[in-house]
């Protein structure tokens, strides 16, 4: 943190103002000083984030309609979407959500993840991060050394904080099927990132989330309220990426859900955890369902 210091002795006498302009300048400075002091006191509290946890993540896919149908049938048949083109769906996963947008010719991927922040002050955060050499882009997105993007979002900015009428106007809803969802989602459980160099990446994540809660041979884990963020070393030869997400769901029959996933076009994957069911959706995105 850069600190400005005066070179003059603090014991030097104050010069007497010689004009109305100087008197006005002194009055303005006196009025502003409490605000500046308060800002300086607040700035250390901006980081690590005071977060209520991971709130949503976004994916970019080849066909938004197809992906919306898949995730709507899996988690929540009633989707919301942006009122204006391009098509962008939002799928509820219990208290959290998935944002689905078009990849526009790029490979399908999880594009970003979002931490919801208490008492968030965007302008102050932008200035604070600038001192760390970080730039906050559109919609509060900031990238780690590999370009993996974290979205900073205040609780008051979240769509879930809007009154029902305002939300319906901003994001009209559409029901894609009369059938119930394959599983009953509760909330996002974790998001896992694969980075090219763990030690290079760690200062970024510690800046935002504080000390890790656990470290093992594969990487580190941060506990963010009731959610977890895994920052692991990418296997040799594989690119850095947001690798997968896991949703806590109500207890389910594994064979029944596996059969329904296959019917929807998913590809099942192995897992060492009996409480988890791993699969890849039709865009190749890795998804985990965990029985809560």
Which ranges hold each PLM region?
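N-terminal twin-arginine translocation
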Residues: 17-25, 31-45
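Vicinal oxygen chelate
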Residues: 62-66, 108-109, 113-149, 155, ...
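Ordered, small/hydrophobic-rich secondary-structure cores
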Residues: 40-43, 55-60, 71-139
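Core segments of cupin and vicinal oxygen chelate
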Residues: 14-18, 26, 49, 59-98, ...
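N-terminal beta-strand motif that seeds the catalytic metal site of vicinal oxygen chelate
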Residues: 39-65, 110-113, 157-202, 228, ...
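Short, low-complexity cationic-aromatic patches
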Residues: 47-51, 63-65, 90-92, 104-107, ...
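Short, charged/polar, Gly/Pro-enriched secondary-structure boundary elements
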Residues: 96-100, 107, 148-151, 157-160, ...
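N-terminal secretory signal peptides
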Residues: 1-18, 29-32
């Amino acid at each position: 943190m850069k600190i400005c210091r005066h070179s003059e002795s603090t014991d030097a006498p104050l010069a007497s103002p010689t004009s109305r302009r100087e008197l006005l300048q002194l009055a303005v400075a006196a009025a502003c000083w409490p605000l500046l002091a308060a800002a300086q006191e607040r700035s250390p509290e901006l980081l690590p984030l005071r977060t209520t946890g991971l709130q949503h993540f976004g994916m970019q896919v080849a066909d938004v309609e197809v992906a919306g149908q898949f995730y709507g049938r899996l988690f929540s048949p009633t989707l919301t979407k942006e009122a204006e083109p391009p098509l962008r769906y939002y799928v509820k996963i219990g208290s959290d959500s998935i944002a689905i947008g078009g990849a526009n010719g790029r490979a399908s991927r999880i594009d970003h993840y979002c931490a919801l922040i208490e008492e968030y002050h965007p302008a102050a955060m932008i200035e604070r991060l600038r001192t760390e050499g970080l730039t906050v882009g559109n919609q509060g997105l900031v990238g780690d050394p590999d370009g993996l993007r974290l979205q900073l979002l205040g609780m008051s900015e979240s769509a879930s904080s809007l009154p029902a009428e305002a939300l319906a106007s901003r994001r009209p809803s559409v029901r894609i099927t009369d059938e119930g969802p394959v599983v009953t989602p509760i909330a996002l459980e974790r998001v896992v990132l694969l980075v090219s160099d763990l030690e290079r990446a760690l200062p970024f994540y510690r800046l935002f989330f504080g000390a890790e809660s656990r470290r093992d041979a594969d990487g580190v884990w941060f506990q963010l309220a009731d959610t977890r963020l895994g920052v692991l070393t990418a296997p040799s030869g594989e690119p850095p990426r947001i690798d997968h997400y896991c949703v806590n769901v109500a207890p389910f029959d594994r064979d029944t859900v596996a059969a329904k996933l296959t019917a929807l076009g998913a590809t099942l994957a192995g897992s060492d955890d009996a409480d988890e069911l791993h699969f890849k959706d039709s865009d190749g995105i890795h998804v985990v369902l965990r029985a809560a």
